[in-house]
């Protein structure tokens, strides 16, 4: 590894302080890279051909869902609807802190379309969808190169109290990885998150 002499490769043009947590993925239809960056109360989209020179494309998030102090750790994946690979939508995952329904930080998501430049949400701005209703679920990110499935893993804690939890060697832990999918219910599209099948190998015996 050789540190790039022209770092940082991307800075906010408006001098924004909360500009971080970049997620980069390959957008094959246009043979380019796309980067999503959390920028205060929105996510900004950039593209690049060489991973060094980045161009601003669009933003999304302001006024949508829960409007917290800040958005963090964005991610976005394209998923089949109800298992049908011929019908797909994008899921934009956003971690928010604070102001969540059950207190502190949590993970919300938006479903919609992405044309390589701009994300268009399916729902109205006042609609909020939570990825997990557990209290300790934050900073959800997806793995790359997981073949024909999408696997995500969250941080198992909450900014409401993580700094006062007694600890020595580490600050909390990750939750179990889960496989993501899109499903319809009553005409509405939702993101499912089920523990990956590999977790079954951790079970050694059953007790009634």
Q: Predicted segment positions?
A:
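Surface loop/turn signatures of beta-propeller and other carbohydrate-active proteins
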Residues: 1-26, 37, 55-78, 118-140, ...
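Structural motif
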Residues: 42-47, 100-111, 163, 176
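Gly/Ser/Thr-rich phosphate-binding loops and adjoining beta-strand/alpha-helix segments
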Residues: 81
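Beta-rich accessory regions
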Residues: 85, 111-208
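Hydrophobic core segments of beta-strands in well-ordered, beta-rich domains
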Residues: 5-14, 18-46, 56-64, 77, ...
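Short glycine/proline-enriched turns and hinge-like loops at secondary-structure junctions
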Residues: 69, 86, 103-104
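Short loop/turn segments that connect beta-strands within beta-propeller blades
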Residues: 49-52, 114-116
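Conserved Ser/Thr-centered positions that define the repeating blades of beta-propeller domains
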Residues: 1, 45-51
């Amino acid at each position: 590894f050789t540190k790039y002499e022209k770092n940082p490769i991307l800075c906010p043009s408006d001098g924004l302080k909360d500009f971080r947590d970049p997620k980069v993925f390959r957008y094959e239809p246009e043979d380019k890279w796309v980067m999503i960056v959390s920028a205060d109360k929105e996510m900004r989209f950039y593209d690049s051909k060489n991973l060094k020179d980045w161009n601003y494309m669009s933003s999304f998030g302001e006024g949508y869902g829960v409007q917290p102090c800040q958005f963090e750790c964005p991610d976005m994946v394209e998923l089949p609807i109800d298992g049908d690979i011929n019908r797909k939508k994008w899921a934009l995952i956003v971690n928010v802190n604070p102001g969540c329904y059950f207190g502190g930080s949590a993970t919300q998501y938006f479903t919609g379309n992405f044309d390589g430049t701009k994300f268009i949400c399916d729902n109205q701005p006042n609609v909020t969808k939570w990825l997990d209703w557990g209290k300790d679920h934050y900073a959800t990110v997806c793995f790359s190169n997981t073949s024909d499935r999408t696997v995500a893993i969250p941080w198992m804690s909450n900014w409401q109290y993580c700094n006062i939890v007694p600890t020595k060697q580490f600050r909390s832990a990750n939750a179990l990885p889960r496989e993501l999918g899109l499903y319809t219910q009553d005409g509405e599209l939702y993101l499912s998150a089920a523990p990956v099948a590999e977790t079954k190998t951790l079970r050694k015996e059953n007790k009634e």
